[in-house]
Amino acid sequence: MTGTDEVPRNTGSAVVGLFIVAALTAVGMAMAGGPREIGGQALPVAEALTSERAKAPAGTARPTPEEVRELETNPLLADGIALAAVTCRLPAISRDPAKLERYYKTFASCLAEAWKPALDQANEPALPATVQVTLPETSACGKVPSEAEAVAYYCGGDTTIYAPTEWMLSDAGLERSRHLATMAHEYGHHIQRSSGILSAAAEKMTSPDEDSPADKERVRRIELQANCFGALALAAAAGRGSISTSLAGAALDTYGNTDDSDTHGSRRNQLKWAKAGFVGKTTSSCNTWAATASEVK
């Protein structure tokens, strides 16, 4: 899976509405103009939450969950945090827009169920994610990409996964593994948004279009982590309900069906990080922020 996520440079004390886009390209699926590059925009949406959570005295109620604007040390990436095993009972995939929308929304609900215990353990919010299969005229993230640029994208400003049915079907047909891989990856960006990882990354950006070598490396760490988070969720659902072990494995392989990219990582690393989540089964397996530069090339 490929995806070009543009993260805005630091905008002072604002939490940015990150516009995350993921394009899924697979070997054997022809696309005009080759692999689609992804673009994104970001808008300030709210004042930042502090990354220092209040320490509650012994015997008092647990602090209210809040995002933590940290990267390598984000509580979500602590040792021992795992997703819940889930049984995803999905409807039949279809070219009918209403039925495909139901397929995506049902899977997104299953992903939310898998991720909630991990977010609870980190005391971070399980923000609701919306799935929309039509393009908005405007959104909290500004101008939307064209079909030539993306297959699906995530907007952190309105916590919405946009997966236009025409774009998705044109790219993936009815190949369930590719639809699942795309949605799991996009939901991975939603988890980054919920936890504060995206906001923390945004604060580190220094170049106007995130095109400096250092900023591109940060973008790769975001993208590769979304692959890992996506595969982590696939593993949590594998072998139960509508997601057989073989289907989950095929979805995992999708993350390696791409080209090398200076904003998304090498083909090898894109698959490597997905496998890290699928096999490791804990969020700490997805700590791209603690990885060496060569591991996120």
Functional labels for PLM-detected ranges:
Residues 82-101:
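Acidic/histidine-rich, surface-exposed loop or edge segments in extracytoplasmic proteins
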Residues 1-78:
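N-terminal low-structure segments adjacent to metalloprotease catalytic domains
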